[in-house]
A protein has these predicted regions:
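A short, amphipathic edge element
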Residues: 64-68, 103-106
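An amphipathic, aromatic/His-enriched active-site/gating alpha helix that lines ligand/cofactor pockets
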Residues: 85-115
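Short, well-ordered beta-strand segments in beta-rich or mixed alpha/beta enzyme
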Residues: 32-37, 71-94
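Short S/T/G/P-rich N-terminal loop/turn motif that feeds into the first structured element of a domain
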Residues: 4-62, 66, 74-77, 112-125
Length: 125
């Protein structure tokens, strides 16, 4: 999801601020981790990958999605993207839109923080 975008869109810099604990009144958005592979089209357009990321980050920000970190990797996957979205539906919609552009294919997992995991564990009968 995090790397697709139209290279013609004006680019902006990613939010590189360090993660800080949210005030208790602020709702913490769910975190997602996407494992990304370039398609043949994505490989052909590899020189624009960072520009596409900046454009995509700006585009999805209006939907409440924040790309926290993007790593270009060696091995089975070409990228790992860590992002936050307001809910699963929003995450799914931006992932579908990114994949539809044809540069990438992704697998995405919902990630849980330690406090979220504590809440999950507390519900075990």
């Amino acid at each position: 999801m995090c790397f697709a975008g139209d290279p013609q869109i004006a680019t902006t810099k990613l939010d590189e601020s360090k993660s800080k604990a949210a005030p208790e009144t602020e709702k913490v958005k769910p975190t997602y981790i996407s494992l990304v592979k370039f398609t043949e089209k994505g490989i052909q357009n590899a020189k624009q990958t960072t520009q596409r990321l900046d454009a995509w980050a700006a585009k999805v920000q209006s939907m409440g999605v924040t790309i926290k970190q993007m790593y270009w990797t060696l091995g089975e996957y070409d990228q790992v993207c860590i992002f936050e979205a307001p809910d699963d539906e929003t995450a799914a919609s931006v992932l579908l839109a990114a994949n539809m552009l044809g540069n990438i294919r992704s697998q995405t997992m919902r990630a849980f923080t330690a406090p979220e995991m504590e809440k999950i564990l507390a519900k075990i009968p």
